[in-house]
Amino acid sequence: MRSVEEQQARISAAAVAPRPIRVAIAEAQGLMCAEEVVTERPMPGFDQAAIDGYAVRSVDVAGVGDTGGVQVFADHGDLDGRDVLTLPVMGTIEAGARTLSRLQPRQAVRVQTGAPLPTLADAVLPLRWTDGGMSRVRVLRGAPSGAYVRRAGDDVQPGDVAVRAGTIIGAAQVGLLAAVGRERVLVHPRPRLSVMAVGGELVDISRTPGNGQVYDVNSYALAAAGRDACAEVNRVGIVSNDPTELGEIVEGQLNRAEVVVIAGGVGGAAAEAVRSVLSELGEMEVVRVAMHPGSVQGFGQLGRDGVPTFLLPANPVSALVVFEVMVRPLIRLSLGKRHPMRRIVSARTLSPITSVAGRKGYLRGQLMRDQDSGEYLVQALGGAPGASSHLLATLAEANCLVVVPTGAEQIRTGEIVDVAFLAQHG
C-alpha cells in the first residue's frame, strides 16, 4: 500500500504550469502574477488635495488658532480680537482640473478632494477649520506644510515594483494596476480541467431517477471543487462505459484539458471498461493508498501530451476527499503556487475520533475558535469510519478535514490534531 506522501510526490512531479498569458486586469483576479510590474510614473502623478477645503500657503496661516495667542494679520482681512484670519478666496479647483493656477501670498483657493494644488500652495485647510466662506474665508486654525496634501509619488515612485511576480491578484492588486495605468498583466492561466462521471446507475439531475438509479453527484461536486481550486472547468457530465464512446470522449478531453478527472472508474462494473480504454491512451496506475476515505484511486499521464488523469471513487465523499488531497494540489502547482496545500492548524478535539487502522484519516469536522483563549477547537462529524464515508450531508456541514496520522486509530477528547481548512476559510 502506497503512502499518501508517496502518491502526492508522484502526482506533483507531473505538474506543468501552462505558458503565461497576458490578460486584461479585469480578468486577472484570482490568478498569479507572472511578471514584476514596474511603474513608469509616480502615483499620485501630481500634488493633490487629500480633503475638501482650502489650499493655502502654510506660512500665511501659521499660528492661527494657537493657544499661545499668536496673531496673524492679512492684507485683505481683519483680526477681530481672536486668533482668526480672513483670506480672499480666489476661486475653486475641482477634481480633474487640468489647468494649473498660481496661488498668491495671503490668498486661498477652494479645492475638492483629489484636485491638483495650485502652485505655491503647500497645505489644505479642512472645511471644519474655517467658516466655509465662498468669496472670503475665516481661518479658525492654521496648518503646517504638507497638511492634507498627497504629494506626487507618495504612494508609488517611478521604478517601484507595484505587483511582484508570484502575487495572487486580488481586488487591491487590480486597483493598483489600474492606478499605475496598466491595462494588461502577465499571469499564470487557470489550468483547464475536464470532469466526468462513469456509471450505468447514474442519471442527470434534470431527470427523475428510476429503480436502482441515482443522481450524478460527482461531476457537479468535483467541477465545483475544481473551480474552488481556480481551474477553468469543463463539466462533461455522465459518460457511458461503452468502450468506443468512452474512448472517444476521454481522448477528446485529453486534447483540450491540462487535467482530467474521471469519477467511478476504480471499482464496480465500470472499472474494467474504464481501465481497458485508458490503457490504450497511456499508462494508468490504480493503487491502494494508505488513506481513508478514498483508498483505491488511479493516476496516470495519458494522450500525446501526457495529460495528468485521475480515477476517483464513485462514492461522492471519497471522491471529494481524494480530489482535495491529490487533485487540488496539482491544480495549484499548475497555477504557479509554491505552497499548494491547504493551511494546517492545530486544534483540540471536542469528542473522540476513530480512524481506520494503518491509514491516514481525512475526517470531516467543524472548526471553531475559543473566544477567550483563541485556541482552535474541532468537532468531528459523522459516525464510525466504515459506516459514514457515504454521508455527503456531513461533508456539506464541514469546514475542515481532521488529519489523523497513520497509526493513530483512536484520538481522545482533548487531544491535539492537525486540521486542514476547507473552502470557506481558504
UniProtKB/Swiss-Prot annotation:
The keyword Glycosyltransferase does not apply. Its cofactor is Mg(2+). Binds 1 Mg(2+) ion per subunit. GO terms for biological process: Mo-molybdopterin cofactor biosynthetic process. GO terms for molecular function: metal ion binding; molybdopterin molybdotransferase activity. Keywords: Magnesium, Metal-binding, Molybdenum, Molybdenum cofactor biosynthesis, Transferase. InterPro entries: MoaB/Mog-like_dom_sf, MoaB/Mog_dom, MoeA-like, MoeA_C_domain_IV, MoeA_C_domain_IV_sf, MoeA_linker/N, MoeA_linker/N_sf. Catalyzes the insertion of molybdate into adenylated molybdopterin with the concomitant release of AMP. This is Molybdopterin molybdenumtransferase 1. The keyword Metal-binding applies. Its EC number is 2.10.1.1. The lineage of its organism: Bacteria, Bacillati, Actinomycetota, Actinomycetes, Mycobacteriales. Gene3D superfamilies: MoaB/Mog-like domain (3.40.980.10), MoeA, C-terminal, domain IV (2.40.340.10), Molybdopterin biosynthesis moea protein, domain 2 (3.90.105.10), Molybdopterin biosynthesis moea protein, domain 3 (2.170.190.11). Pathway: Cofactor biosynthesis; molybdopterin biosynthesis. PANTHER family: GEPHYRIN, MOLYBDOPTERIN BIOSYNTHESIS PROTEIN. It is an enzyme of class 2 (transferase). GO terms for cellular component: cytoplasm; cytosol; plasma membrane. It catalyses: adenylyl-molybdopterin + molybdate = Mo-molybdopterin + AMP + H(+). Belongs to the MoeA family.
